[in-house]
């Protein structure tokens, strides 16, 4: 074995038919020398690899040639992700890794994962019939995980962030007409969830947001209510409980989603009536009542299961002659009706809790055609005459 060292290089030597090189990284906690090794067919190839490796080390990045993508993702899910996102989102990320990322990329070495590898995965998912939005979620999860690798200094770049992002076409859901909305409200009048449905329709609220409303968030004098929480059903990680899922009342994730709604006098009056009705239900329930401070609770005060609420709403919609509807369609309906009444797009965006007005525009921008036409006609009249 012959050992040679060139000017400005780390150690390079020939081992049989191949050339090998090593770079000194320092010492471990036991005082042992730590080196990073590379190999190639020619001395020049090894020298170039060492040069690139030295550049990464000088920048604070030390690639780990041993860890696989799956091992890294598992470590990220177990140690880095918890506490940074909602529990339901954490469950979704675990499922995305288990079902999509680990099977396709898991056996690859993390340091050798390329943009092409990731792009090929997205294409394979498209060929398998997955929607652009589903692939976008997969890309988001991988990008966030690899960002942790960058922070740790074991990745020089984020290949997921550099991969081709799928184009997602936002689609507007089915919406109620004014007449249908009135028919629904007439049908639900007097029902225990009439105010919940009114709020969901008037402000385009998600069902979890409606069910997460707290009495403490209602300002009776100002006539406002603050959205701060949402009710969701998530996986139960406590194996001793024997349950697969559990209900949680969690804080809304983003600053834009935590928002204040201005109530009409009619809605304030409806809420007062509901408050009185709930006080009577509390007395009737006696010791069974569990006070969570929720505006829309079960008959014993506990959080209402969103799926049960959906079932109740669907039955009421059918009773109103509308057929099968889902509560989320009240959100689309509320947004569409607000825009139809001339509410400015940025106001609708704030009421819906979108993170940016661009999202609102992508989903509901086509409803503004009449506004654009009116603006064009006004400008034409001002500039060119009637």
What residue spans do the PLM features occupy?
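N-terminal core-binding DNA-recognition domain of tyrosine site-specific recombinases/integrases
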Residues: 38-42, 62-66, 70, 74-159, ...
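Short functional hotspots where side chains directly engage DNA or cofactors
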Residues: 160-162, 222-230, 326, 337, ...
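C-terminal secondary-structure termini that scaffold catalytic or DNA-interacting sites
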Residues: 1-3, 62, 186, 222, ...
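Short, Arg/Lys-rich segments that mark the N-terminal edge of DNA/RNA- and chromatin-recognition modules
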Residues: 1-39, 88, 228-236, 240
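Well-ordered beta-strand positions in beta-sheet-rich domains
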Residues: 35-39, 175, 224, 258-260
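Basic, Lys/Arg- and aromatic-enriched nucleic-acid-binding interface segment
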Residues: 132-140, 151-215, 220-221, 232, ...
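Short, basic (Lys/Arg/His-rich) helix/loop patches that form interaction surfaces
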Residues: 4, 128, 132, 182-193, ...
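A short, charged, amphipathic alpha-helix used as a generic interaction element across diverse proteins
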Residues: 40-57
């Amino acid at each position: 074995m012959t050992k040679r060292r060139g000017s400005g290089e780390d150690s390079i030597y020939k081992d049989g038919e191949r050339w090998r090189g090593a770079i000194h990284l320092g010492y471990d906690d036991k005082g042992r020398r730590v080196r990073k090794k590379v190999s190639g067919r020619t001395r020049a190839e090894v020298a170039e690899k060492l040069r690139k490796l030295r550049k990464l080390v000088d920048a604070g990045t030390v690639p780990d040639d041993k860890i696989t993508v799956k091992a890294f993702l598992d470590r990220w899910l177990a140690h880095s992700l918890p506490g940074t996102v909602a529990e339901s989102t954490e469950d979704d990320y675990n499922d995305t890794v288990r079902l999509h990322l680990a099977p396709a990329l898991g056996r690859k070495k993390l340091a050798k994962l390329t943009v092409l590898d990731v792009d090929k995965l997205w294409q394979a998912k498209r060929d398998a019939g997955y929607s652009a939005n589903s692939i976008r979620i997969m890309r988001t999860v991988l990008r966030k995980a690899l960002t942790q690798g960058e922070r740790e200094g074991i990745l020089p770049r984020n290949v997921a962030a550099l991969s081709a992002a799928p184009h997602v076409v936002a689609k507007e859901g089915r919406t109620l007409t004014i007449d249908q909305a009135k028919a629904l409200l007439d049908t639900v009048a007097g029902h225990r969830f009439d105010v919940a449905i009114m709020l969901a329709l008037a402000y385009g609220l998600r069902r979890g947001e409606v069910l997460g409303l707290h009495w403490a968030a209602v300002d009776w004098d100002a006539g406002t209510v603050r959205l701060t929480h949402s009710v969701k059903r998530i996986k139960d990680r406590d194996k001793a409980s024997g349950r697969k899922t559990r209900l949680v009342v969690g804080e809304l994730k983003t600053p834009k989603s935590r928002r204040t709604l201005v109530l009409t006098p009619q809605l304030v009056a409806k809420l007062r009536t509901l408050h009185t009705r709930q006080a009577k239900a509390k007395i009737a329930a006696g010791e069974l009542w569990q006070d969570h401070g929720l505006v829309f609770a079960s008959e014993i005060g506990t959080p209402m299961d969103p799926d049960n609420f959906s079932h109740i709403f669907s039955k009421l919609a059918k009773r109103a002659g509308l057929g099968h509807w889902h509560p989320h369609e009240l959100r689309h309906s509320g947004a569409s009706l607000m825009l139809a009444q001339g509410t400015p797009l940025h106001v609708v965006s704030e009421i819906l809790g979108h993170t940016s007005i661009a999202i609102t525009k992508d989903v509901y921008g086509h409803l503004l055609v009449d506004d654009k036409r009116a603006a064009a006609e006004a400008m034409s009249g001002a500039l060119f005459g009637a």
